[in-house]
Regions:
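Low-complexity, glycine/proline-biased repetitive segments and flexible coils/loops
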Residues: 1-169
Length: 169
């Protein structure tokens, strides 16, 4: 879900694809598409709604015979799933606007259907994929949710965050 302050909106990450939603959800960082028969849906688009500078990248593609694709991150898109290998989530971005170095908006990994997602990407709050339902992205970090292999559901995207910094005189 997005976080809004006045006219500033920080879009949350997109959810990963899965049996309950073959097509991944779009967001600041797009979700990765599901893998496994009969899935292989469409990826989530990044930077949705479109703003400049962009808030994220698209997810990676899954396929009917391959594991799920990874979710897009702030910096890079998610990678596609391949036989035996889940797609990695795209890299998030680091900033220190709140006084400490924090990673945000990483893409969630895909699932290989038999265990943990090979492409786990904790960088920036992306959810990990697994042989069970995908994990949600971290709250207030805008990470994409982990993708899932049929018959499980993908994880929800993490909510965005708006941080206001000003100098008091």
């Amino acid at each position: 879900s997005p976080s809004i302050f006045s006219t500033i909106t920080s879009t949350g990450g997109g959810g990963g694809g899965g049996a309950g939603a073959t097509n991944a959800r779009s967001g600041g960082s797009g979700g990765g598409a599901a893998g496994g028969i009969p899935c292989g849906g469409t990826v989530g688009a990044g930077n949705t709604p479109s703003v400049s500078p962009p808030q994220g990248s698209p997810g990676g593609q899954g396929a009917g015979t391959a594991p799920a694709g990874g979710g897009g991150g702030a910096i890079d898109p998610g990678s596609a799933g391949a036989p035996g290998t889940a797609g990695a989530g795209g890299d998030g971005a680091t900033n220190n606007i709140d006084g400490s170095s924090t990673d945000r908006a990483g893409g969630g990994s895909g699932s290989n259907g038999t265990g943990t997602g090979n492409g786990s990407n904790p960088f920036g709050g992306g959810g990990t994929g697994s042989g069970v339902p995908g994990t949600a992205g971290t709250t207030n970090k805008g990470g994409g949710g982990g993708g899932a292999y049929t018959p499980y559901n993908g994880g929800a995207g993490g909510s965005g965050i708006v941080i206001i910094r000003y100098k008091f005189q």
